[in-house]
């Protein structure tokens, strides 16, 4: 069976979502990468670069530069890691926490308006299908 049409639609759906989401994030005065970091660190305890990398959608090769630019803009501070002297912990500044408190709920509401165009049952089915599909590619030997 040729799954090319599934692959194309999956990619197009992601690209459509990314465009829709990114447009709003930019209207909020952030880049998508900045929003990802702020949304991940917002209302959370400080975390290491490794933890942040695991929880964001940012490639590991880009993360250091992104964080350094956000430190320079006054969005992130580094703290000593009491559990590992070789690493630092990252935390939002009060300035960035205010950005999170305003932008995160606004963006979630923006996305919710789009998802409300589909019935809850259909969204649940789609979520389950995507989880199954992800498992195929993240556990290919299973």
Annotated model-derived regions:
Residues 4-8, 28-39, 61:
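Short alpha-helical elements of helix-turn-helix
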Residues 1, 109, 120-142:
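C-terminal regulatory/oligomerization modules of transcriptional regulators
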Residues 18, 68-125:
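Charged, amphipathic alpha-helical coiled-coil/dimerization segments
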Residues 44-48:
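Short capping segments at the starts of secondary-structure elements
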Residues 1-28:
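N-terminal leader segment of winged-helix/HTH proteins
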Residues 20, 36-39, 98:
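Pre-recognition alpha-helix immediately N-terminal to the DNA-recognition helix
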Residues 49-50, 61, 68, 88:
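Residues within helix-turn-helix
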Residues 53:
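The alpha-helix within a helix-turn-helix
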């Amino acid at each position: 069976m040729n799954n090319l049409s599934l692959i194309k639609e999956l990619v197009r759906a992601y690209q459509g979502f990314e465009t829709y989401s990114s447009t709003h994030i930019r209207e909020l005065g952030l880049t998508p990468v900045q929003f990802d970091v702020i949304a991940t660190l917002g209302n959370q305890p400080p975390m290491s670069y490794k933890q942040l990398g695991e929880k964001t959608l940012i490639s590991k090769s880009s993360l250091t530069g992104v964080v350094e630019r956000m430190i320079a803009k006054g969005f992130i501070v580094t703290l000593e890691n009491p559990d590992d002297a070789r690493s630092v912990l990252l935390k939002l500044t009060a300035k960035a926490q205010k950005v999170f408190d305003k932008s995160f709920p606004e963006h979630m509401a923006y996305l919710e308006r789009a998802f409300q165009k589909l019935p809850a049952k259909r969204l649940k089915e789609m979520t389950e299908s995507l989880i199954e599909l992800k498992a195929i590619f993240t556990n290919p030997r299973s």
